[in-house]
Amino acid sequence: ATVRTVNARLARMGRKLGPDPASEIACTIGGVIANNSSGMACGIAENTYQTLESATVLLANGEIINTDDWDSDAQLKAKASDLYQTLGQIKEEISARPDLISEITRQYRMKNTMGYGLNSFIDYSSIIDIFLHLLVGSEGTLGFISEAIFNTVPLLTHAATTLLIFENLNAATEALTTLIATNPATIELMDCASLRAGKVDMQGIELNQHAALLVEYQVQEESELSAVMASAAEVHAQLGTVNQAQLTTEVKTRSEIWHIRKGLYAAVAGARRSGTTALLEDVSVPIAQLASTCLELQSLFTKHGYDDAVIFGHAKDGNIHFLVNEDFKDPKLAERYRCFTEEMVDLVLSKGGSLKAEHGTGRMMAPFVERQFGAELYAIMVRIKEAFDPSGILSPGVLISTDALSHMRHIKFNPPIQKVADNCVECGYCEPICPSKDLTTTPRQRIVLQRAIATAKSNGDHALLAELVKSAEYHVEETCAVDGLCESSCPVGINTGILVTTLRTERNGTIYANVWEQAAQHWGATLTGISMGLNVARLIPSQIIEALNRSLRNYLGSEKVPLWSKELPKGGKPREFAASDKPDFVFFASCLESIFEAKTAESLKSLSRKAGLAFTTPPTISDLCCGTPWKSKGLVDGYKSIVEATYKSLVKASEDGRLPIVCENSSCTEGLIQAIKSRTDSKLRIIDSIDFASEFLLPNIEIPKKMNSVTLHPTCSSTLLGSHTSFETLANAISEKVSTPLDWGCCAFAGDRGALHPELTASATKAEAAALALEGEDFDAYLSTNLTCEIGMSRATGKGYQHILVAVNELARSRRS
C-alpha cells in the first residue's frame, strides 16, 4: 500500500499518516518505515519514528517478533538472546556517558536518517521499544517488517497557500525565522534554477537570482482560517518580497502552486541528457546555517560544472534537496562526481548538519556515516548491525560499509532507449494506477526492461538479449492496456502505452497488418460480420464454440483471436444515417454498439429529443471509427486510413466545426480527440456524451423520482478527458446516494485486450470488485461511461453495469411535457 491509498481511507475518519512525503503517490508503507520518511509538514514531530506504534518483524535468524504482543519483550529475549543482551549493554553504556547523550541529542534535533537511530537508546527504556525504533530507517539491514501499526494524526482539511518570491536565496532564507513564527504547516524553498525548471509565472519579473518560499497554513476548522490568513498576511507584507503574493484557499490555484514544487525533481531529471543518471541528494542543517549552506552549495555546482543543478526542499526544517545529473560511463565525469561529493560532505558537516535527512543512508552515503557521527558512535552502529545480522546476509553494504568508495561502485547506468520513454526517472509514480501491476509489469518496469534490453545489446550478451526480448512479448507488450493513465501520473508526461504500441508495430507481421488495412477499407462490412458471428455463436452449444475458439487461439495465437465467453452481449446493429434540417450537434455513434448490443446510443438520442435538441450524423457513419483498434495494436497504415476517412466525414457533417461532435462511449471520444490532435488547422470540437449531457441535456429535462443509490466506475478515458465532475453531476441528478469505490481503476478491457487476455482484466478489476463486495450494499444501478468497461466490470463483479445515460434516460422526462 502507498501513503496515498492509506490516507484516502483514513480521510473518511478525519485522520492521516504522520509522514507526508511529496512522493506519497508512490511511497509504500514499507519504504516509509525503512527510510524513516518524513516530508513537507511533519518535520521530526510526526515522522515514522515518532508515529510507529508496533511492527511484526522477521529476524535474520528466522524468528518472528510482533512488538504489539503483550509479552514481546520476553519473546525477543527468548528468541534472540544475544541481540537482546547487546541492546541492553549499549543502552547502559550510552546512559553512563553524558557526552554521548549530548552528541546524539544534537544529531537528532534536526532531520537525520544517517546510520541507525541511536536516539532510540535515549528516548526509550524498554529493550523491545529500542528494538522497534532501531528498525525504523534501517533500510532492510536489520530485519524484514511484514506488518506495522501507526498512530495517526488529525487531517487538517482547510488550507491557505502562497508563493513568496525574493530577490535572492539569501533574502529568502533570512525570512525563515520570521515565517516560522507564524506557525505554517510547510515552508518549501526553491532556488532560481528550480523556478526556471518549474516554469514559474514570475508576474512580469525577469528571473535573475530570485528564490521562492512556498508557504502553507493548515487548520482543522474553516472558521479558524480567516484569522490565520489575516495574521500571516501582515507578516508577509513586511518580508520584502518582489511579488504581490496573496494567500489563497482556491483549490485549483493551490494545486498549481504545489504542482511546481512536487514536479521539480522530475522536471529537472526528466530534462537531463540521454544516458545520464539523475542523483537527488538530501541534507539538513540548523536553520541558522541554511543560507550559507545553500550559497556554498551553489558555488560547488559552479566549480564542478553542474550547471543544471537545483536546490529545493523543506526549509522550515533546514532540510534541502539538490539534484545533479552525471554521466558515470565517462571516468573523468565519475571522478568529478566523487570530488564533488567529498566537498559537499565536508560542507554539510562543517555546518553541523546531517548528510541524510529523510531519504535514508543507502549505499551512496554509507562511506560517510563514521565521518558524521565519529568513531565511537559509529562503532556502536557496527555492533548493532552485527547483533541483528551476525552473518551479514541482510542488505550487505547498505548503511554500514567498510569500502570508502562503495558509493562509486555498481552505479546504475541509463542507456538510451526509445525517445518516448528515454527521460523516465523511474520514480514509480505510474505504478499504483497501472492495471497490469499485479499481473506482469508496470510502466516503470516496462521501461526498465527496455533499458536492460539495450544494455544486453550493447554488451553483446546475445543469450540474455534473446531471453529478455522473449519475456517482454507477454510481460511488456501483450498485457499492457495502453490506457494512457500512466501519463496522467507521470511527472515528465510519459505515456508508456505509446512505447508499447511502437513495440507492437515492430512485431506485427505483414499479413496481419494487411488484414487490418483491409478492415479499415471495409469497416462497416467487418462490423456486420463480427456482430453476426456473435449472434451465430449464441445458437451453437457453448462447448462446441469454446473448443473451436481454443483451437483457433492455439493456432493463431492469443494476440490474434479473442477468447469467446457466454457473458458477451449479443451482436449489435449497423449504425444508420440520421439527418436534421437544423441540427444542434453531430452524433458520432461509436462502432462498439455495432459489435455489441447496447442501449447507450439510443438513450442519447432519446435524451436529446426530450431536451429539445436535434442531431445529425455523418452520411457514411457505418464505415467510420475513431481508430483506436488500429492505434492500440500498432497498425500504423490502417490507423491512418480509417482516421483520414473519419476526419473528412466529420468536417463535412459538422460544417467545418460549427457543430459540436458528440460520442457516446468515452474511449471513442478520447480516441477521436487523439486522432485530430496533430491537425493544427482543425476546428472540430469533440465532446464526450456525459459532458454534453451534463451541460446541455440535464438543464432541459426533469427527473421526477431518484433512485436510492448508485455506484460509479470511472473509466481511464473519462479520467483522461477530465469528465469525472460531469459523471458525478449526472449521478447526483438521478440518485440520492452516489459512491465511487476507493479502489476503482482501469478495468483493462481496453477494446479487445480483455477478450484477448482475460487474465489482465481479472487482475485489474480484483481490488475494485473486492471493495464493492466489502461494502455489502446492493446498489440500484452500477454505472460507467464506456461499453467494454461495462462488460469488464460486469464480468468482475457479477453486477449489471450500464452506461449512465441509459439510467438517466429511463428516469428523465422533458421539461416541456
Task: Identify the residue ranges that each predicted region occupies.
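Iron-sulfur cluster-binding electron-transfer modules in prokaryotic oxidoreductases
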Residues: D389, T496-S817
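Iron-sulfur cluster-binding cysteine motifs and their immediate structural context
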Residues: I393-V398, Y429-A452, T479-E506, G671-L672, ...
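FAD-binding subdomain of flavoenzyme oxidoreductases
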Residues: V3-N170, A181, S391-S401, L405-S406, ...
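Short glycine/threonine-rich loop-to-helix capping motif typified by GTGT followed
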Residues: R196-N208, S255-L264, H321-R336, M365-L377, ...
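Ferredoxin-like iron-sulfur electron-transfer modules
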Residues: V369-R371, S406-E426, S458-V482
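C-terminal substrate-recognition/cap domain of FAD-linked oxidoreductases
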Residues: S120-I128, L132-C339, V345-L347, K351-G352, ...
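Non-heme iron-sulfur electron-transfer modules
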Residues: I400, S406, K437-A472, G493-A519, ...
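Activity-critical C-terminal alpha-helical subdomain
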Residues: A267, P367-P416
